[in-house]
Amino acid sequence: MIQEYFKKSLEKKWEPNDIPENIFNQDCDWPYSYIDFDADFDKMLKEIISLEETYFVKHRDKDKLNSYFHEGWNAVTLHGIDSTKTEHFDRYGFKTQEDANYVWTDVCEYLPTTVEFLKSLGYSQYDRVRIMKLNAGGYIMPHTDGKGRIFGPFNIAINNPEGCNFVFKENGIVPFKKGRGVFLDLGREHAVWNNSNEDRYHIIVHGHINPKLLNDSISHTKNTHGHN
């Protein structure tokens, strides 16, 4: 099933039109915008791999029964309730983020380069920040994260093995590569398949976005899309 879905989705292609006045608007047709970073992602990857057996936990394991299926999806939280709580605070009985008391978690001491980079993004407030691992051969079946436009989660590729793809059903492949951060509209149907022999590591940042970072990503997408 995942093979057929990807075959159809990869036939689709999105090209950016005029720069939107407000990329968060419900009628905006941009599924993503991206920016490329000049940072030591090889060093970050080494830090992250060192956490392997000790800290990564299965992410959204209950969704295999109650929602969409996935295989080989693991995570560790860098900013949140604690390193093992990888889902939204309401899954753990909290009514607000303030009650959940998000903090930079204990694993951050093992990831100095990674955390320094994340703090340099200039968010005025960090919400959940997680490393998401998709095992070699792993996949996340087609789904949406909710109704309407859900633009803003920032997905940064620490690595992105050849053969590992994130696709939108109606917009085709998202051009991830090592060192590229992508703001995504997760209200659109999407799926991920790591059809490679290498584990994939991305970081997802939620929070109050640095406006300059977002605007730079929009301009960068408009100027470079289809060229790299």
Model-derived features with residue positions:
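Non-heme Fe(II)/2-oxoglutarate
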Residues: 1-118
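A short glycine-rich, His/Asp/Glu-containing loop-to-beta-strand
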Residues: 116-136
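A short beta-loop-beta micro-motif enriched in histidine and acidic residues
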Residues: 125, 139-153, 169
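Short, conserved beta-strand element in jelly-roll/cupin
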Residues: 133-135, 148-163
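A short hydrophobic beta-strand segment most commonly corresponding to one strand
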Residues: 152-158, 181-183, 197-215
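A short beta-strand-loop-beta hairpin characteristic of the jelly-roll/cupin
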Residues: 157-177
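Conserved metal-binding segment of the jelly-roll/cupin
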Residues: 174-190
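Asparagine-centered strand-capping/turn motif at beta-strand->loop junctions
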Residues: 191-196
